[in-house]
């Protein structure tokens, strides 16, 4: 008998699904089941149909809290479910029962696959909408779609109807990423290229993980003049490129590499770690007294910073721990001591004319986008090897935490343009899309006619909504790995291969030769 069922992440057991006492991510079976209850309650709320600002907030919070590596705390998950139930009763005199998620997991293979693509896409999109909302940006059309799509998940739908919703999820997510892009750039300025050190300076410091730039800004303000340095971790690295964040002299550098290495890298760390979003792994004894969560992130017995965003406990812990007695050198995954970031759409498009001329003159043969989520699977070395094998006359755009597989490499430059250009966080796929569209316009061709190939890694649900956006835009010949999602049925995969030439990654040498027609 199954104790849980979850197959939403790339590391799901046997690439079929986690169904025992705990998932591969570390969440217990009861936690997984409570998260399903939250989704079931949201589907009931969506079917009630009476949207308010409060229900919008709960939609985003509820979906976000069920993303992989966000919330391991049954108490807070059940509180969210109770809040949803109360609001559902408040907005409608008609009773709308919670949807039983077991019905979705037991559905026919293709219906389950398509509904899962929609649901996991909604989860990823909710994270982006949540961050935008924190900066005062909302889009009524994006908000409405959460209700439409969730309500549909609780109904009988044909595969054709569900496929339309899959692509519509991608369309709405494009608008949502544009919303977050506007929120971030209006608040913090357009990112500029910057070199970020990986050495941790001596003295007190705080490590900030996750994606929430607003939380980072508040922490920078509260630590000003206190003799505490701030270091980004994992997906927070692109913060260094934003003028309104990089202006703080105590935002010093980046700590460590991808999220999946945190249990090793945080071992006995003499400083606190603040998790603003995923990815949080089960916390180990050697640093558990130094971990803090905020926003939707929650873990049993770990102190949580509430909505008032008073980071005093984190600051006090930093002063108590004291940091390293001497400068503490760290390296990237390939031994590098610095990384670069800040090559978002404006920074890259400032050189669009040069890139076009370099392509036309044959100095740039091809452009790759190598990025997405990172993870622990050994097969993810594919992305490092692929980047290393790319010819010297090719450019690499990268983004999200998958960048750590290659971002400390020194691959040189072409005509003064670095061969590795970090566009930002996973939501900055929007920047990469804008760059591709601008280059296509400059060349007078379609995006699929550009010398451009996307080589994507996925792990969790934000990668799903980005993939759906790329499919909505009609992008072809995407390479996806390190495995095909367990929730993509053979028939759905066949459809994606036939209509979009989606290609599972194989080995870097073979794939590179196929892409470059060698």
Would you name each region that the model predicts?
Residues 2-31, 35-36, 168-518:
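Anaerobic metallocofactor- and corrinoid-dependent redox/one-carbon enzyme cores
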Residues 2-203, 207, 227, 234-237, ...:
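Long, compositionally biased, glycine/small-hydrophobic-enriched stretches that function as flexible linkers
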């Amino acid at each position: 008998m199954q104790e849980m069922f979850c197959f939403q992440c790339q590391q799901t057991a046997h690439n079929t699904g986690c169904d025992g006492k705990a998932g591969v991510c570390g969440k217990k079976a009861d936690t997984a089941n409570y998260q399903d209850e939250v989704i079931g309650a949201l589907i009931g709320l969506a079917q009630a149909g009476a949207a308010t600002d409060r229900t919008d907030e709960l939609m985003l919070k509820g979906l976000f809290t069920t993303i992989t590596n966000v919330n391991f705390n049954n108490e807070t998950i059940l509180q969210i479910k109770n809040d949803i139930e109360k609001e559902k009763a408040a907005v409608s005199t008609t009773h709308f029962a919670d949807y039983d998620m077991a019905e979705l997991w037991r559905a026919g293979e293709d219906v389950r696959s398509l509904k899962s693509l929609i649901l996991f896409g909604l989860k990823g999109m909710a994270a982006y909408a949540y961050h935008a909302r924190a900066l005062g940006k909302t889009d009524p059309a994006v908000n409405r779609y959460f209700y439409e799509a969730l309500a549909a998940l609780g109904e009988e739908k044909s595969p054709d109807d569900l496929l339309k919703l899959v692509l519509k999820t991608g369309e709405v997510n494009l608008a949502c990423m544009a919303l977050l892009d506007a929120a971030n750039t209006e608040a913090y300025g357009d990112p500029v290229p910057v070199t970020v050190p990986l050495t941790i300076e001596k003295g007190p410091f705080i490590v900030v993980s996750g994606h929430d730039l607003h939380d980072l800004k508040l922490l920078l303000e509260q630590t000003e003049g206190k003799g505490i340095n701030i270091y980004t971790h994992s997906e927070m690295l692109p913060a260094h490129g934003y003028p309104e964040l990089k202006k703080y002299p105590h935002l010093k550098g980046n700590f460590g590499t991808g999220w999946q290495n945190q249990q090793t890298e945080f071992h006995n760390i003499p400083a606190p770690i603040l998790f603003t979003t995923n990815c949080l792994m089960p916390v180990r004894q050697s640093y558990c007294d130094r971990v803090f969560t905020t926003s939707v992130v929650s873990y049993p017995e770990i102190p949580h910073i509430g909505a008032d965003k008073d980071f005093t406990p984190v600051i006090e812990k930093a002063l108590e721990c004291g940091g390293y007695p001497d400068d503490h050198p760290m390296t990237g995954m390939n031994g590098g001591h610095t990384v670069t970031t800040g090559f978002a759409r404006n920074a890259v498009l400032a050189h669009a004319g040069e890139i076009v001329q370099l392509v036309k003159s044959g100095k740039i043969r091809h452009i790759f986008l190598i990025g997405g989520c990172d993870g622990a699977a050994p097969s993810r070395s594919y992305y490092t090897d692929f980047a290393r094998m790319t010819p010297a006359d090719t450019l690499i755009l990268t983004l999200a935490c998958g960048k750590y597989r290659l971002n400390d490499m020194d691959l040189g430059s072409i005509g003064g343009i670095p061969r590795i250009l970090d566009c930002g966080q996973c939501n900055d796929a929007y920047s990469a899309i804008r760059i591709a569209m601008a280059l296509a316009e400059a060349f007078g061709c379609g995006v699929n006619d550009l010398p451009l190939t996307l080589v994507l890694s996925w792990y969790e649900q934000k990668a799903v909504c980005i993939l759906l956006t790329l499919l909505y835009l009609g992008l072809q010949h995407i390479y996806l790995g390190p495995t095909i999602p367990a929730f993509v049925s053979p028939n759905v995969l066949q459809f994606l291969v036939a209509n979009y030439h989606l290609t599972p990654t194989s080995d870097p040498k073979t794939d590179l030769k196929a892409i470059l027609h060698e």
